[in-house]
Design a protein with these regions (language model features):
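N-terminal secretory signal peptides that target proteins for export/translocation
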Residues: 1-2
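Extracytosolic ligand-binding ectodomains
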Residues: 5-9, 20-433
Length: 433
């Protein structure tokens, strides 16, 4: 089964057009190529590869999940999953890989290493918001290189006051997940007060906790405290503070192992042993379930909802079998779909903007590439409809699911059944809806 994944771009005349994603696509004749010495100009000689980068946390399952999806996107460049890399405009695609360590230092260092290749066109990454904000996004923006993230969710990355001009993301803004979790807590469960526990110094964790507190307050609830974990903040002391505050629910947005340590500490006190706990996708891990054992039962986990993906025929009958052949297993979440879409948008933008000079040299203007992404409207990808706005947010909305342990996707795969689902759009949220 073949299905071409096409971005719909708004061209200067205002018409919406679609391009074909197969090997028969040809670059435009040279007409307005960028200056040879210009900072945005990449020249790809005959027989030379197009260089793309990946900047991921490959020590985690989510990072390797994304990497596998990028490989499948390259496989599908010729319009079929056949286990062999396709070509883009007659050129092989070579992916340069760097580790971002889920840290600002790792993100900056990895980005600096990637731009040592002067012909680097674009990068898929980062895995962690902390590795991007003021780190990888700053380095790559200065170098005029696109950074398209499949899994960054921190709201500040696309805040107009902070967003870097070459930064885009396919993952939904965490303002949407925070709003959905607040709906679950306040509306569905009737919990009126909460304490949040975040990873000290981590952008994703801090901002998701903060956005949840804002959403809960807007609904009429109360955030009693936002507590850091990690570093000099022992989990036993955090549990005692939570017991003293007596909230209706605790939201933990920290990573492993601090997340399970905090949950274990909460479960160890008589006053909080039955206190409802919600964790974010950062803590929705097999390690958490193993560490808590029987105490994990009933712990809720929120994450992007990927159960809907198999409703799509291309995903179910094309992508998923290819993923299984390549990896021997199933994807663990939704970020693999974001990665496939992110790569497809980059490839389509290259097709639309590249020009060929006499002699066959392919010229890619990275500035035209950036503008092409800003023109994406109504692209129907694996992860849903994408429209890339001026802030760099491309996901039009978010589907969020809440699962009750042990029925988590990491344990049950696609068979995991959410206890709560919510669909939010960025337009709704911006309007306060």
């Amino acid at each position: 089964m073949r299905r071409r994944l096409i971005a719909l771009l708004v061209i200067a005349s205002g018409l919406v057009v679609g391009g074909c994603a197969g090997s028969e696509d040809a670059p435009q004749p040279a007409s307005a190529a960028c200056p040879v010495s210009g900072p945005t100009c990449v020249r790809v000689g005959v027989g030379q590869p197009i260089y793309l980068g990946e900047l991921l946390n490959l020590t985690t399952a989510s990072g390797t999940d994304v990497q596998q999806s990028v490989r499948l996107a390259i496989d599908y460049l010729d319009g079929v999953f056949d286990g062999a890399p396709g070509q883009l405009l007659g050129h092989d695609v070579e992916v340069l890989s760097q580790e971002e360590e889920c840290s600002a230092v790792g993100g900056r260092t990895g980005a600096l290493r990637l731009i040592q290749e002067p012909s680097l066109v674009a990068v898929v990454g980062t895995t962690c918001s902390t590795a991007a904000l003021g780190a990888a996004d700053a380095v790559l923006s200065e170098a005029n290189v696109l950074l398209v993230s499949p899994s960054n969710t921190a709201p500040s990355l696309t805040d107009p006051e902070q967003r870097r001009r070459t930064y885009f993301r396919i993952a939904p803004n965490d303002a949407l997940q925070a709003s959905a979790v607040a709906d679950f807590a306040y509306v569905r469960e009737g919990w009126r007060s909460a304490v949040t526990v975040h990873a000290a110094g981590d952008v994703y964790s801090e901002q998701l906790a903060g956005a949840f507190g804002e959403s809960l307050t807007l609904l009429g609830g109360e955030l009693l405290a936002d507590l850091p974990v990690g570093g000099d903040a022992p989990t036993e002391e955090i549990a005692r503070r939570i017991a003293a505050l007596a909230p209706d629910v605790v939201l933990i947005t920290a990573f492993s192992p601090e997340c399970e340590q905090a949950a274990l500490a909460i479960r160890s006190l008589a006053a909080t042993r039955t206190l409802p706990i919600v964790v974010s996708e950062a803590c929705q891990t097999a390690e958490f379930l193993r560490a808590l054992g029987a105490d994990a039962r009933g712990v809720y986990a929120s994450s992007p909802d990927f159960t809907y993906l198999e409703e799509d025929a291309f995903y179910r009958d094309g992508f998923l079998p290819a993923y299984r052949r390549q990896t021997g297993g199933d994807p663990i979440g939704v970020f693999h779909a974001h990665a496939f879409d992110g790569f497809a948008l980059i490839a389509d933008a290259i097709r639309r903007t590249a020009v060929v000079e006499p002699g066959g040299v392919l010229v890619i203007d990275r500035e035209r590439l950036r503008r092409a992404l800003l023109e994406v409207r109504g692209y129907q990808g694996l992860s849903g409809r994408l429209t890339c706005g001026s802030t760099g947010d491309c996901a039009e909305g978010a589907r969020v699911a809440v699962y009750a342990a042990p029925e988590w996707p990491v344990a049950r795969g696609a068979g995991a059944k959410p206890v709560f689902r919510s669909q939010k759009t960025l337009a709704q949220f911006s309007l306060g809806g």
